[in-house]
């Protein structure tokens, strides 16, 4: 009986997640994904890059706040791009004879190719942002190692100097 109840509760929890998987991501979800990718790529420099509150515990929240506008732009741009692809009369010609719905697939009823397209485009934007953050971190570490005095003059000598550098050099904020 316990196993049946556990199984039913897991199915009940999984249903909203499965339904959500077909919808295009919201700007908040995109900002969270950007910050999760940045946290993974920056490692310990993540907290210094985004700063923290007095209890030194809110770098992720500050990251999400700082990426909110970029996330909104990523979702809007992805949506515009996908709408343009869907309306393109030559789409099948440039995609091996496949229609928009065939290229991006869809849900079980085949009606969510647009959502899949937007989701893929946003994932690409998140990956590009993570790559930019990692590249900025490498560049900043190299600059700090090459000339500590110049680095300190530009970004300060405090423990958040590396974070300031990464924020400044990251192409997408």
Residues of each region from the PLM?
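Positively charged n-region of N-terminal signal peptides that target proteins for export
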Residues: 1-4
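Bacterial N-terminal signal peptides
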Residues: 7-15
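Mature extracytoplasmic/periplasmic regions of secreted or cell-envelope proteins
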Residues: 20-173
């Amino acid at each position: 009986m316990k196993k049946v109840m556990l199984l039913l509760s897991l199915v009940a929890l999984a249903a909203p997640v499965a339904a959500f998987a077909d919808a295009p991501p919201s700007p908040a979800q995109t900002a969270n994904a950007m910050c999760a990718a940045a946290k993974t790529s920056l490692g310990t420099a993540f907290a210094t890059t985004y700063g923290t509150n007095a209890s030194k515990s809110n770098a992720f929240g500050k990251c999400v706040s700082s990426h909110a506008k970029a996330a909104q732009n990523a979702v809007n741009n992805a949506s515009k791009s996908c709408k343009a692809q869907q309306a393109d009369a030559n789409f099948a010609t440039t995609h091996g004879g496949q229609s928009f719905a065939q290229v991006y697939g869809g849900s079980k009823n085949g009606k969510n190719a647009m959502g899949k397209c937007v989701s893929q485009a946003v994932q690409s934007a998140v990956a590009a942002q993570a790559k930019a953050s990692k590249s900025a971190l490498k560049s900043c570490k190299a600059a700090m190692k090459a000339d500590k005095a110049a680095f300190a003059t530009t970004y300060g000598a405090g423990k958040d100097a590396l974070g300031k550098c990464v924020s400044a050099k990251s192409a997408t904020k």
